[in-house]
Amino acid sequence: MKPYKAPGPDGLYAGFFQRFWLIMGDSMIREVERVFTTKKVPNFLHKTLIVLIPKIQDPETLGNYRPISLCNTVYNIITKLIVTQIRSHLDNIISPYQIAFISRRRGTDNIVIAQELIHSMGRAKERTGYMAIKIDLEKAYDKIEWAFIREMLIEFNFPDNIVYLIMSCVSSVSTSLLFNEGCLESFLPSRGIRQGDPLSPYLFILSMEYLGYLIEEKCEAKLWSPIKASRSGPAFSLFFLRMTFSFLLRQIKIIAMP
């Protein structure tokens, strides 16, 4: 962990624990072990501060800011340990069309595939239309439902103890907004994951994988049809760049005019 990254509500940097590990190490280890034993994160570790970071030079609306969550150092250690447990399984879960946070995968691969698919759509001579949908997931972290996260983790066969622990991390958050060098009154969110939480990127790509799984179900049921860049090539229905792309064979025949 970076020693002097912005601290959470407790005001303690990771560097503080690193410097005084001989004094505080045993207490921290006991607390982390207790969380993994009980599968529950205590409320005092759940407290989070939100700071608004401008996305552009001169922000004018709330949409021009990115909310970053400042979590307590001990909480970050817990979620990093959870990430260590689930990261080794991601290669077996995440499709090859997702590249974020997965080792040995390159974003340039998907860029090339997208270009080839769009090129093939442009030169297609069939009398059937094609459709490419670019989905910009605005405020995606804020809009993920907790029930969806639980359903997704169960569907991917994560062990019950990991599911309980992740849901405890996600759904028991007390948040306060930093504003004008002070903290506003805390509130309890009812959905979403935190930007700045080490666990959040992995929950997000798993959620996107579940979306892809649902689309594949539609394709297998012949309700949607994926497309191919060539007759003998693989079929594509969904993959990911910075945005989400969905490639479909449009089920509307083009009628020739007399």
Predicted regions and their residues:
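Nucleotidyl polymerases of mobile genetic elements and RNA viruses
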Residues: M1-P258
